[in-house]
């Protein structure tokens, strides 16, 4: 194989390589044997057409495209490796010569990984706005949240207040004409929940069961139903019931109702304190890691980040998001319909963070390379076993899904992140 690379501009160039006749001839034989099985040529049994007759009747060249399709992927990968390139986007391939009896010549316009000039990435000073200490207020807030979850709704005679639930019938109209979706019966509405159009819930505060209220609201300009957007509507609303939350007493019985593993309120508080301490410690570590990596990225210089890398990152993020939806049993088309968004909106959303994420990945990879980090066979095996345990998969399944190179890359990245983080100090 002959390989050459010519730089055209920063992070871009043309890779030229050949596929030799030593590779082409056996592949031609294989393709011919496959093709002749389906050929019907007068005078010959199906599948028994001699090669010279085929070449005379159809031409050896008729097999070239199938041969090229079979050989090109591996030939391109080998050329990239021999040229010592790190390609970061799909190449633009052009077959420049496929002459009979000669090596085939291919060119590929490629985008290469940009140069990263590292600044300081060890012993960084960072600031984080995350508290490690667990306060009594933190514990009480957690218990109060669980206590409210156990609250019961009881009918009250007094007027409705924010936080109450009202059971209502309503009929909506615009200029005296009812509209689709504007009617409901025995609907439970939490006042202050924001379930309804802004202003609707506020107008029920201060009213009691048995009252009928004319609620006047204006649909938001960006309302999903375009025929209603920006229009004023009247909802004739009848209140059937007003219900208030009744929370249980703060005692040992409540503690046992919240968590059957504890006996007293004091036990529950101690358990929550430990859980919150663990969660806060993790949040603190994550904040330090994020701040340290952000600082390392700020200290580095990336020479002309290619747009193609950002596009690849957006594409990867969108596919990951849509894949997660499908794994949860959510049809992407249904998601877009419900949220009133499009796939283009999703691309635009990820576009904003793709450049930052791409820069971060490049800097971490550069740190791993600068430090000479590698991964041993033992480390790779340990990573496979951990992934299998995390995702409830067989070890063999993980090995089939992830190549050794991918696993090695992930391990070296983790080592780089650990180095940046562990040497950082918090101001």
Swiss-Prot record:
Q: Could you state a single Gene Ontology molecular function term?
A: peptidyl-prolyl cis-trans isomerase activity
Q: What catalytic reaction does the record list? A: [protein]-peptidylproline (omega=180) = [protein]-peptidylproline (omega=0)
Task: Please state where this protein is localized.
Answer: Cytoplasm
Q: Name one GO cellular component term.
A: cytoplasm
Q: What is this protein called?
A: Trigger factor
The protein's matches in HAMAP family, at most eight in alphabetical order, are given as: Trigger_factor_Tig
Residues in PPIase FKBP-type domain copies: 163-248
Q: Name its GO BP terms in alphabetical order.
A: 'de novo' cotranslational protein folding; cell division; chaperone-mediated protein folding; protein transport; protein unfolding
């Amino acid at each position: 194989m002959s390989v050459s690379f010519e730089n055209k501009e920063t992070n871009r160039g043309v890779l030229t390589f050949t596929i030799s006749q030593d590779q082409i001839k056996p592949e031609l034989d294989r393709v011919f044997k496959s093709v002749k099985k389906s050929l019907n040529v007068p005078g010959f049994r199906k599948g028994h057409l001699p090669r010279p007759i085929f070449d005379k009747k159809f031409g050896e060249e008729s097999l070239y495209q199938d041969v090229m399709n079979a050989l090109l992927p591996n030939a391109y990968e080998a050329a990239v490796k021999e040229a010592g390139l790190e390609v970061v986007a799909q190449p633009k391939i052009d077959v420049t010569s496929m002459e009979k009896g000669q090596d085939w010549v291919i060119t590929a316009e490629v985008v290469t990984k940009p140069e990263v000039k590292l600044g300081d990435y060890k012993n960084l000073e960072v600031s984080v706005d995350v508290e490690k200490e667990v306060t009594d207020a933190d514990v009480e807030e957690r218990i109060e949240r669980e206590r409210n979850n156990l609250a019961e709704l009881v009918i009250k005679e007094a007027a409705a207040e924010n936080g109450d639930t009202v059971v209502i019938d309503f009929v909506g109209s615009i200029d005296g004409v009812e509209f689709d979706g504007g009617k409901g019966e025995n609907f439970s509405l939490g006042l202050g929940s924001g379930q309804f159009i802004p202003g609707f819930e506020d107008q029920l505060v201060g009213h009691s069961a048995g009252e009928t209220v004319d609620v006047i609201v204006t649909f938001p300009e960006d309302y999903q139903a375009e025929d209603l957007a920006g229009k004023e509507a009247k909802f004739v609303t009848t209140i059937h019931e007003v219900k208030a939350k009744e929370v249980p007493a703060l005692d040992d019985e409540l503690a046992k109702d919240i968590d059957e593993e504890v006996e007293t309120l004091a036990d529950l508080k101690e358990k929550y304190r430990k859980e919150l301490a663990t969660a806060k410690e993790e949040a603190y570590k994550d904040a330090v890691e994020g701040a340290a990596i952000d600082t390392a990225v700020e200290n580095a210089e990336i020479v002309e980040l290619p747009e193609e890398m950002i596009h690849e990152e957006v594409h990867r993020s969108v596919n990951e998001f849509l894949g997660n939806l499908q794994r949860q049993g959510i049809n992407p088309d249904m998601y877009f319909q419900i949220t009133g968004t499009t796939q283009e909106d999703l691309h635009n959303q990820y576009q904003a963070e793709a450049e930052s994420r791409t820069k971060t990945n490049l800097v971490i990879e550069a740190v791993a390379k600068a430090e000479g980090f590698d991964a041993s066979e033992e480390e790779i095996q340990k990573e496979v076993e951990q992934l299998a345990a995390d995702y409830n998969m067989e070890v063999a399944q993980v090995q089939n899904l992830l190549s050794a190179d991918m696993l090695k890359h992930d391990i070296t990245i983790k080592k780089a992140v650990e180095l940046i983080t562990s040497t950082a100090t918090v101001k």
